[in-house]
């Protein structure tokens, strides 16, 4: 990890602006453990690039849109550890990233010049929502964040070769856990339940994610 460049959030934003201005399409993957600040960083990047270069230039496409539905997780017996690597449609996510990068350098999306529609995740109902995010042909920066973008198992391991760059969010564990407890409480858990989920379920996922962060292009201190 010591050989990787470590950026501040401001430096990461500047790097994203440079990618957006470089011509063609760049797709940046942001990895990190639960609560590391991936979505916050992705939103900041997209907001600042949009402010500088115009609407539609940058779009955020979260990996969380590929969560399996709760009914599917119930059927598989995995609902009690939602967020683990086998609770996502991994092949579906990789296929979407391929579509987003297929016409790299042309400003197209999947080679057809048409808009690509991506799913989002609605935390209010704790479910993925299909066809929520438009990525039009003129988009030159796609930012996609998720836990497992650097995982070494199939099909996840294909992703680093598809992204223009991969960024890994790094943060102190105590800060990360506090963020998770707050998030889980906002979505209905009591403090004890929120902390248990953050330490046990999210914690197990964090161990897996952290082991692969050395594969990122750069680290971002979040």
Predicted feature residues:
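Extreme N-terminal, non-catalytic leader segments
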Residues: 1-27, 33
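Residue-level preference for the first positions of well-ordered beta-strands
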Residues: 25-29, 57, 141-143
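Conserved lysine of the Walker
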Residues: 38
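Hydrophobic positions on the alpha1 helix immediately C-terminal to the Walker A/P-loop
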Residues: 41
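Post-Walker A helix-loop "phosphate-sensing" segment adjacent to the P-loop in P-loop NTPases
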Residues: 47-59
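Conserved nucleotide-sensing/catalytic segment adjacent to the nucleotide-binding pocket
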Residues: 62, 68-125
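ATP-dependent NMP and nucleoside kinases share a basic, alpha-helical "lid"
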Residues: 125-183
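Small-molecule kinase domains that catalyze NTP-dependent phosphoryl transfer to phosphate-bearing small molecules
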Residues: 130-131, 154-157, 185-222
